[in-house]
């Protein structure tokens, strides 16, 4: 097993690395992860998506390599579009306690179906 595969395999989402936010001003962090993949829980076919994360930090920010490893940890999991989006949102909200959090997952069409999942803390 190569080192990247080992990092993804051994990644524990509960230990996602966060750093102190050293800035007091209100600002938005936008992260785009265009290589999300998981497996359909029904068929086993691969699903691909671009993940868009926007958040206004409070006291913590997520370390970028950690979020990359977390997203990559889905690639061999059988998980629905809805469950993957909600799991990512819930983990980030729990770990960061941001002032605002918005997550969008834009899945590539498969079988003539295009799915977009959006979760917004301002609407919950």
UniProtKB/Swiss-Prot annotation:
Protein's organism: Wolinella succinogenes (strain ATCC 29543 / DSM 1740 / CCUG 13145 / JCM 31913 / LMG 7466 / NCTC 11488 / FDC 602W) (Vibrio succinogenes)
Protein family according to the UniProt entry: Belongs to the GTP cyclohydrolase I family. QueF type 1 subfamily.
Subcellular location: Cytoplasm
Lineage: Bacteria, Pseudomonadati, Campylobacterota, Epsilonproteobacteria, Campylobacterales
Active-site residues from the entry: 40 (thioimide intermediate), 47 (proton donor)
Superkingdom assignment: Bacteria
Biological role: Catalyzes the NADPH-dependent reduction of 7-cyano-7-deazaguanine (preQ0) to 7-aminomethyl-7-deazaguanine (preQ1).
Keyword terms: Cytoplasm, NADP, Oxidoreductase, Queuosine biosynthesis
Assigned GO CC terms: cytoplasm
Protein name: NADPH-dependent 7-cyano-7-deazaguanine reductase
Catalytic activity reported: 7-aminomethyl-7-carbaguanine + 2 NADP(+) = 7-cyano-7-deazaguanine + 2 NADPH + 3 H(+)
Disulfide bridge map: none
Pathway noted in the entry: tRNA modification; tRNA-queuosine biosynthesis
Keyword Oxidoreductase: yes
Record-level Gene Ontology MF annotations: preQ1 synthase activity
E.C. no: 1.7.1.13
GO biological process, one term: queuosine biosynthetic process
InterPro entries according to UniProt: GTP-CH-I_C/QueF (IPR043133), NADPH_dep_7-cyano-7-deazaG_red (IPR050084), QueF (IPR029500), QueF_type1 (IPR016856)
Annotated binding of substrate, by residue: 62-64, 81-82
Record bears the keyword Cytoplasm: yes
């Amino acid at each position: 097993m190569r080192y990247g595969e080992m990092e993804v395999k051994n990644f524990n989402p509960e230990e996602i690395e966060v750093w102190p936010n050293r800035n007091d001003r209100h600002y938005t962090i936008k992260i785009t992860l265009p290589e999300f993949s998981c497996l359909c829980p029904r068929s086993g076919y691969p699903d691909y998506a671009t993940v868009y994360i926007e958040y206004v930090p409070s006291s913590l920010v997520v370390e970028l390599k950690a979020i990359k490893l977390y997203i990559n940890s889905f690639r061999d999991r059988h998980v629905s579009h809805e469950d993957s989006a909600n799991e990512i949102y819930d983990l980030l909200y729990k770990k960061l306690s941001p002032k605002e959090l918005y997550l969008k997952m834009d899945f590539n069409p498969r079988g003539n179906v295009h799915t977009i999942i959006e979760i917004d803390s301002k609407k919950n």
